[in-house]
Regions:
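Membrane-embedded catalytic cores of phosphoryl/pyrophosphoryl-handling enzymes
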Residues: 128-220
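Membrane-water interface at transmembrane helix exits
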Residues: 53, 57, 90, 112-120, ...
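Hydrophobic, lipid-facing residues on alpha-helical transmembrane segments of integral membrane proteins
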Residues: 102-114, 199-207
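Alpha-helical transmembrane segments of integral membrane proteins
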Residues: 26, 70, 96-104, 167-171, ...
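Alpha-helical transmembrane segments of multi-pass membrane proteins
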Residues: 39-40, 105-116, 175-179, 183
Length: 220
């Protein structure tokens, strides 16, 4: 949050601070993320994490065609996808939204990488023998899931910006949950990495919503 505030222009920062004072739900979400991060110290939590991860990654039906579909689906959470989406919005004359997507993506990436360095949690394929790896071996640490955080950030922001109804919002979040599931399926993340990423991405999306009037007021 501090990183986000430092990067924001002064006008947007003042707007955000004022809005935060009335956002108890957002504060609760930040607190929830902190609890998830602290739970990494819980031994029983690691055992549960491992059990659920192996259930999704190793057990059950895993045909080759499904592996390919899941690998493609997980790319929705890639930063490249976000930049391509921002480019599309720019071409379609949603320029403030394009800038918001790029700014939010970059600051979220910086935050995720900082938290990963602090928590220093190894990827499951480094700790669990026999883990199935679909695609390439992801670099870096495991908590939180950057792909999941990125997807939840985008879906939260887009749902707000386009004022989607319940059905549209549910469809966007269904995609976000799917990306979270794929991160375990491809062997890149534990369940708590995904849950933490979902909460963090949602927080970033809400923060983007709060400063949305600032971006709408700029000319691009």
């Amino acid at each position: 949050l501090i990183v986000f505030l430092v990067w924001l222009p002064s006008g947007a920062r003042a707007l955000l601070i004022a809005a935060l004072q009335a956002q108890r739900v957002l504060v609760g979400m930040i607190f929830l993320f902190a609890l998830i991060a602290l739970s990494l110290l819980w031994t029983a939590g690691q055992r549960l994490d491992t059990w659920v991860f192996l259930l999704i990654n190793l057990r059950g039906y895993h045909p080759k065609w499904l592996d390919h579909v899941v690998w493609l689906a997980t790319q929705v959470g890639n930063m490249v996808t976000a930049f391509l989406l921002a480019g599309l919005f720019f071409v379609l004359n949603y320029r403030s939204l394009a800038v918001e997507v790029i700014f939010g993506t970059l600051t979220l990436w910086l935050l995720v990488e900082t938290i990963k360095a602090l928590t220093d949690r190894a990827r499951p394929f480094l700790a669990l023998e026999g883990t199935r790896i679909i695609g390439w071996r992801e670099r870096g640490r495991s908590f939180p899931s950057g792909h999941t955080a990125q997807t939840f950030f985008l879906m939260t922001l887009l749902s707000h910006r386009f004022q989607l109804d319940v059905g549209g919002t549910a469809a966007l979040y269904a995609v976000a949950f799917l990306v979270g599931f794929t991160r375990m399926y491809v062997g890149a993340h534990y369940p708590r990495d995904v849950i933490g990423g979902a909460v963090l991405g949602s927080v970033w999306g809400v923060l983007a919503m709060l400063v949305d009037p600032y971006w709408l007021g700029l000319r691009f």
